């Protein structure tokens, strides 16, 4: 039987919300739990949380859009903003824990991509794919 892709559910989150990350975690966990084992849900939620934290910190966008879609045995998450992507310095403000988010996201999922907008068409899209084992 061929694998099928289920259209995703998208939710917009105001970037100034004090509960944004908790709201995103609940949204992603609810959308992925029927398809993935709990450890995989946890990994995916961690990666999405990092993507959203990066969007809040670096994009200047008023909102962040998160989509949860099912692609065969996999859950695909996209995190989109309307800001301008800025590459950070290797270590920001002397914080050795800073600037590891992209590596963390890639380590937590089966496939990871980042599409940067341009000056003419702003916006960054992070795509995260986690598949059932």
Give the label of every model feature segment.
Residues 22-49:
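Conserved short strand/loop->alpha-helix "switch" segment adjacent to the catalytic nucleotide/phosphoryl-transfer site
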Residues 76-102:
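Glycine-rich/acidic phosphate-handling loop/turn and adjacent ATP-lid/helix
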């Amino acid at each position: 039987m061929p694998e099928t892709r289920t259209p995703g559910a998208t939710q917009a989150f105001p970037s100034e919300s004090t509960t944004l990350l908790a709201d995103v975690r609940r949204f992603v966990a609810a959308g992925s739990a029927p398809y993935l084992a709990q450890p995989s849900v946890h990994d995916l939620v961690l990666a999405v949380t990092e993507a959203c934290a990066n969007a809040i910190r670096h994009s200047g966008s008023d909102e962040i859009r998160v989509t949860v879609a099912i692609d065969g045995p996999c859950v695909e998450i996209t995190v989109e903003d309307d800001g301008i992507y800025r590459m950070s310095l290797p270590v920001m403000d002397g914080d050795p824990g800073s600037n590891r988010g992209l590596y963390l996201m890639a380590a937590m999922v089966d496939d990871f991509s980042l599409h940067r907008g341009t000056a003419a068409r702003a916006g960054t899209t992070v795509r995260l794919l986690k598949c059932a084992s």
